Amino acid sequence: MKILVLGATGRTGRLFIHKALEEGHSVTAYVRNPDKARALLGTHPNLTITPGDLNDTERLAAASAGQDVMASLLGQKATVREFLHSTFLQERLPLIMQTVTGAGVKRCVLLSAYGVGDTVRTASLPMRLVCKVIMHGIFTDKVKADALVAEYQPYISRAHPGR
């Protein structure tokens, strides 16, 4: 399978890529900083590191061409500002989805978090407080971004790890 990974140099992205390569998949890591990506990800015959910005639709479309799956493992930096208010995914995810599906990608996996959307109902009281108070900005951004890309069903699968 050919997999395009966004958020490749983050902790989850690195783990995902190493597992995908271990299982024999071809991976394209779309990254802002190729030198950083090479240092973090190393080299592998099935790994392609493609430089680009999430707002550069032409470059993202070119990286998406021929891919079977796009895995968005994007996340916000854990800063006080992001915890209080974030629009990172709301601003980027609709454009990303339009671009990659327009380039022919048929399946998109979006990393979310346990406590976002319907999953908050199954969380313990302390976890719900964390979701609603401490992580409010980041989780609100994820919920709003999900709503903005809902039109792309059935292309989207969401992962809510952490339970």
What would you call each of these model-derived segments?
Residues 26-28, 34, 91-137, 151, ...:
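Conserved Rossmann-fold NAD(P)-dependent oxidoreductase catalytic core, especially the SDR/UDP-sugar
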Residues 146-163:
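Conserved beta-loop-beta element that borders a ligand/cofactor-binding pocket
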Residues 77, 114-116, 163:
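Active-site segment of SDR-like NAD(P)-dependent oxidoreductases
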Residues 15, 38-95, 99-102:
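NAD(P)H-binding glycine-rich loop region in Rossmannoid oxidoreductase-like domains
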Residues 3-5, 70, 108:
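Conserved hydrophobic beta-strands of the Rossmann-like cofactor-binding core
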Residues 3-25:
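N-terminal Rossmann NAD(P)H-binding glycine-rich loop of SDR-like oxidoreductase domains
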Residues 26, 46-48, 155-157:
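Conserved beta-strand segments of alpha/beta enzyme cores
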